[in-house]
Design a protein with these regions (language model features):
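PLD-like (HKD) phosphodiesterase/transphosphatidyltransferase domain
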Residues: 43-119, 251-252
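PLD/PLD-like phosphodiesterase catalytic module centered on the HKD motif
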Residues: 1-40, 84, 94-252
Length: 252
Protein backbone atom coordinates (compact mmCIF):
# COMPACT_ATOMS: atom_id res chain seq x y z
CA UNK A 1 0.00 0.00 0.00
CA UNK A 2 1.75 3.13 -1.22
CA UNK A 3 1.31 6.19 -3.42
CA UNK A 4 3.12 8.10 -6.13
CA UNK A 5 3.14 11.81 -6.97
CA UNK A 6 4.07 13.46 -10.26
CA UNK A 7 5.01 17.14 -9.92
CA UNK A 8 5.70 18.90 -13.23
CA UNK A 9 7.62 22.01 -12.23
CA UNK A 10 11.14 23.14 -13.17
CA UNK A 11 11.87 24.74 -9.79
CA UNK A 12 10.93 21.56 -7.93
CA UNK A 13 12.95 19.47 -10.38
CA UNK A 14 15.95 21.77 -9.81
CA UNK A 15 15.79 21.21 -6.04
CA UNK A 16 15.81 17.44 -6.53
CA UNK A 17 18.60 17.65 -9.12
CA UNK A 18 20.76 19.58 -6.64
CA UNK A 19 20.21 16.86 -4.04
CA UNK A 20 21.03 14.15 -6.55
CA UNK A 21 24.26 15.87 -7.59
CA UNK A 22 25.35 16.16 -3.94
CA UNK A 23 25.14 12.40 -3.64
CA UNK A 24 26.44 11.65 -7.14
CA UNK A 25 29.57 13.79 -6.94
CA UNK A 26 31.57 12.91 -10.04
CA UNK A 27 29.83 9.55 -10.25
CA UNK A 28 32.16 6.65 -11.08
CA UNK A 29 35.13 8.96 -11.67
CA UNK A 30 36.99 7.74 -8.62
CA UNK A 31 37.00 10.92 -6.52
CA UNK A 32 35.63 10.54 -3.01
CA UNK A 33 33.35 13.56 -3.32
CA UNK A 34 29.90 12.02 -3.11
CA UNK A 35 28.01 13.42 -0.12
CA UNK A 36 25.63 11.30 1.93
CA UNK A 37 24.09 11.57 5.37
CA UNK A 38 25.26 14.49 7.47
CA UNK A 39 28.08 15.01 4.98
CA UNK A 40 25.60 16.83 2.74
CA UNK A 41 25.78 19.83 5.06
CA UNK A 42 22.26 19.60 6.51
CA UNK A 43 20.41 21.57 3.79
CA UNK A 44 17.59 23.85 4.85
CA UNK A 45 14.06 23.36 3.50
CA UNK A 46 13.28 24.83 0.08
CA UNK A 47 9.82 26.33 -0.53
CA UNK A 48 8.39 26.62 -4.04
CA UNK A 49 5.12 28.38 -4.91
CA UNK A 50 3.03 26.52 -7.49
CA UNK A 51 0.21 28.93 -8.20
CA UNK A 52 -2.67 27.75 -6.03
CA UNK A 53 -0.38 25.36 -4.16
CA UNK A 54 3.03 25.44 -2.48
CA UNK A 55 5.57 22.74 -1.70
CA UNK A 56 8.34 22.65 0.88
CA UNK A 57 11.11 20.12 0.25
CA UNK A 58 13.49 18.89 2.95
CA UNK A 59 16.31 16.39 2.50
CA UNK A 60 17.35 14.75 5.80
CA UNK A 61 19.38 13.81 7.74
CA UNK A 62 20.07 16.66 10.16
CA UNK A 63 21.54 16.94 13.63
CA UNK A 64 19.20 16.87 16.60
CA UNK A 65 19.79 20.56 17.27
CA UNK A 66 19.03 21.66 13.70
CA UNK A 67 15.88 23.85 13.77
CA UNK A 68 14.46 22.20 10.65
CA UNK A 69 15.19 18.52 11.18
CA UNK A 70 12.48 16.26 9.84
CA UNK A 71 10.67 15.43 13.07
CA UNK A 72 10.59 19.09 14.07
CA UNK A 73 9.28 20.03 10.63
CA UNK A 74 6.45 17.50 11.01
CA UNK A 75 5.71 18.67 14.57
CA UNK A 76 5.45 22.25 13.32
CA UNK A 77 2.80 21.21 10.80
CA UNK A 78 0.87 19.15 13.37
CA UNK A 79 0.82 22.19 15.63
CA UNK A 80 -0.83 24.25 12.88
CA UNK A 81 -3.89 22.00 12.82
CA UNK A 82 -7.06 23.60 14.13
CA UNK A 83 -9.56 20.82 13.38
CA UNK A 84 -8.23 17.53 12.06
CA UNK A 85 -5.10 15.40 11.61
CA UNK A 86 -5.16 12.13 9.65
CA UNK A 87 -2.03 9.95 9.64
CA UNK A 88 -1.20 6.77 7.70
CA UNK A 89 2.38 5.57 8.18
CA UNK A 90 4.52 2.47 7.91
CA UNK A 91 6.78 3.23 10.90
CA UNK A 92 5.90 5.51 13.82
CA UNK A 93 8.63 5.38 16.45
CA UNK A 94 9.25 9.08 17.24
CA UNK A 95 8.34 9.80 20.86
CA UNK A 96 8.36 13.56 20.22
CA UNK A 97 5.60 13.24 17.63
CA UNK A 98 3.53 11.03 19.95
CA UNK A 99 3.90 13.75 22.59
CA UNK A 100 2.83 16.39 20.05
CA UNK A 101 -0.26 14.39 19.11
CA UNK A 102 -1.18 13.91 22.76
CA UNK A 103 -1.16 17.68 23.25
CA UNK A 104 -3.19 18.31 20.08
CA UNK A 105 -5.79 15.76 21.19
CA UNK A 106 -6.05 17.52 24.56
CA UNK A 107 -6.61 20.77 22.66
CA UNK A 108 -9.59 19.29 20.83
CA UNK A 109 -8.08 18.43 17.45
CA UNK A 110 -9.55 15.26 15.90
CA UNK A 111 -6.68 12.80 15.29
CA UNK A 112 -6.87 9.52 13.38
CA UNK A 113 -3.80 7.26 13.12
CA UNK A 114 -3.25 4.12 11.06
CA UNK A 115 0.03 2.19 11.07
CA UNK A 116 1.28 -0.97 9.42
CA UNK A 117 0.02 -4.04 11.34
CA UNK A 118 3.47 -5.63 11.37
CA UNK A 119 5.06 -2.56 12.93
CA UNK A 120 2.31 -1.37 15.27
CA UNK A 121 2.90 -4.03 17.94
CA UNK A 122 6.69 -3.70 18.15
CA UNK A 123 8.20 -2.44 21.43
CA UNK A 124 9.32 0.90 19.95
CA UNK A 125 5.98 1.61 18.26
CA UNK A 126 4.36 4.88 19.29
CA UNK A 127 1.04 3.35 18.28
CA UNK A 128 1.22 1.52 21.61
CA UNK A 129 1.79 4.84 23.39
CA UNK A 130 -1.36 6.26 21.83
CA UNK A 131 -3.23 3.17 23.03
CA UNK A 132 -1.90 3.61 26.56
CA UNK A 133 0.30 0.49 26.41
CA UNK A 134 3.99 -0.17 27.06
CA UNK A 135 5.72 -3.24 25.61
CA UNK A 136 9.19 -4.30 26.86
CA UNK A 137 11.65 -5.50 24.22
CA UNK A 138 13.42 -8.89 24.13
CA UNK A 139 15.75 -7.62 26.89
CA UNK A 140 12.73 -6.68 29.04
CA UNK A 141 13.59 -3.00 28.64
CA UNK A 142 11.25 -0.15 27.75
CA UNK A 143 12.04 2.65 25.33
CA UNK A 144 13.79 5.60 26.99
CA UNK A 145 11.39 8.45 27.83
CA UNK A 146 8.46 6.17 27.01
CA UNK A 147 5.19 7.99 27.79
CA UNK A 148 2.04 5.93 27.11
CA UNK A 149 -1.15 8.00 27.09
CA UNK A 150 -2.91 7.95 30.45
CA UNK A 151 -6.20 7.76 28.53
CA UNK A 152 -6.03 5.51 25.44
CA UNK A 153 -6.90 7.31 22.21
CA UNK A 154 -9.84 5.65 20.46
CA UNK A 155 -9.00 6.65 16.88
CA UNK A 156 -5.86 4.54 16.44
CA UNK A 157 -5.59 1.28 14.56
CA UNK A 158 -4.25 -0.86 11.76
CA UNK A 159 -5.82 -1.43 8.33
CA UNK A 160 -6.98 -4.84 7.16
CA UNK A 161 -4.61 -5.79 4.34
CA UNK A 162 -4.27 -8.74 1.99
CA UNK A 163 -1.76 -11.37 3.13
CA UNK A 164 1.77 -10.15 2.39
CA UNK A 165 0.75 -6.50 1.92
CA UNK A 166 2.17 -3.65 3.99
CA UNK A 167 0.88 -0.19 4.75
CA UNK A 168 3.87 1.61 3.24
CA UNK A 169 2.36 5.10 3.18
CA UNK A 170 4.12 7.91 5.02
CA UNK A 171 1.52 10.66 4.90
CA UNK A 172 -0.56 12.97 7.03
CA UNK A 173 -3.35 15.36 6.10
CA UNK A 174 -3.77 18.55 8.12
CA UNK A 175 -7.18 20.29 8.15
CA UNK A 176 -7.96 18.91 4.67
CA UNK A 177 -5.54 21.39 3.09
CA UNK A 178 -1.92 20.33 3.78
CA UNK A 179 -0.26 16.99 3.00
CA UNK A 180 2.92 15.68 4.63
CA UNK A 181 4.51 12.92 2.54
CA UNK A 182 7.74 11.59 1.05
CA UNK A 183 10.04 8.68 1.87
CA UNK A 184 10.33 9.86 5.48
CA UNK A 185 9.22 7.36 8.14
CA UNK A 186 8.20 8.96 11.43
CA UNK A 187 11.34 7.82 13.19
CA UNK A 188 14.57 9.26 14.65
CA UNK A 189 16.56 7.30 12.06
CA UNK A 190 14.77 9.07 9.21
CA UNK A 191 15.48 12.48 10.76
CA UNK A 192 19.07 12.01 11.90
CA UNK A 193 20.64 9.12 9.95
CA UNK A 194 19.01 8.29 6.62
CA UNK A 195 19.01 10.12 3.30
CA UNK A 196 15.30 10.84 2.89
CA UNK A 197 12.79 13.16 1.23
CA UNK A 198 10.15 15.04 3.24
CA UNK A 199 7.49 17.06 1.42
CA UNK A 200 4.99 19.54 2.86
CA UNK A 201 2.40 20.30 0.18
CA UNK A 202 -0.18 23.02 0.73
CA UNK A 203 -3.00 22.06 -1.63
CA UNK A 204 -6.64 21.42 -0.69
CA UNK A 205 -7.09 19.60 -4.01
CA UNK A 206 -4.27 17.15 -3.28
CA UNK A 207 -5.36 16.84 0.36
CA UNK A 208 -8.77 15.68 -0.85
CA UNK A 209 -7.18 12.69 -2.64
CA UNK A 210 -5.19 11.70 0.44
CA UNK A 211 -8.27 12.11 2.64
CA UNK A 212 -10.15 9.70 0.36
CA UNK A 213 -7.33 7.17 0.76
CA UNK A 214 -7.40 7.62 4.54
CA UNK A 215 -11.17 7.10 4.60
CA UNK A 216 -10.81 3.97 2.44
CA UNK A 217 -8.23 2.47 4.79
CA UNK A 218 -10.22 3.52 7.86
CA UNK A 219 -13.27 1.56 6.74
CA UNK A 220 -12.84 -1.87 8.24
CA UNK A 221 -9.64 -1.01 10.12
CA UNK A 222 -9.04 -2.70 13.46
CA UNK A 223 -9.14 0.04 16.07
CA UNK A 224 -7.68 -0.14 19.55
CA UNK A 225 -5.54 -2.99 20.88
CA UNK A 226 -5.65 -5.72 18.25
CA UNK A 227 -5.45 -9.45 18.97
CA UNK A 228 -1.87 -9.42 17.67
CA UNK A 229 -0.91 -6.61 20.05
CA UNK A 230 -2.62 -8.34 22.96
CA UNK A 231 -0.69 -11.56 22.32
CA UNK A 232 2.61 -9.66 22.31
CA UNK A 233 1.68 -7.74 25.44
CA UNK A 234 0.67 -10.91 27.30
CA UNK A 235 3.77 -12.80 26.17
CA UNK A 236 6.09 -10.04 27.38
CA UNK A 237 4.12 -9.55 30.60
CA UNK A 238 4.70 -13.20 31.47
CA UNK A 239 8.36 -13.01 30.47
CA UNK A 240 9.28 -9.56 31.81
CA UNK A 241 6.64 -8.25 34.14
CA UNK A 242 6.31 -4.48 33.70
CA UNK A 243 9.83 -4.11 32.30
CA UNK A 244 12.43 -1.48 33.14
CA UNK A 245 13.15 1.73 31.26
CA UNK A 246 16.40 1.92 29.35
CA UNK A 247 19.14 4.07 30.90
CA UNK A 248 21.67 6.19 29.00
CA UNK A 249 24.99 4.53 28.15
CA UNK A 250 27.78 6.31 30.09
CA UNK A 251 30.10 8.42 27.92
CA UNK A 252 33.64 7.19 27.32
Amino acid sequence: MNHQLQISDRAVASVFKTEFMRMWGDGPGGLQNSQFGRGKGEPNPARIDLGEAAITVLFPPHGRQHPHHGLQTIANELNKASRRIDIAVFVFSAQTLADTLQQRIKEGVSVRVLADPGFASRPFSEVLDLLGKALPDHECLLERHNRPFSEPHEKVGTPRLARGDKLHHKFAVIDNKTVITGSFNWSPAAAHTNDETLLIIESPQLAKHFSHEMDRLWRGAELGVTARMQRNLERQRIHCGAGEQRTPIPAG
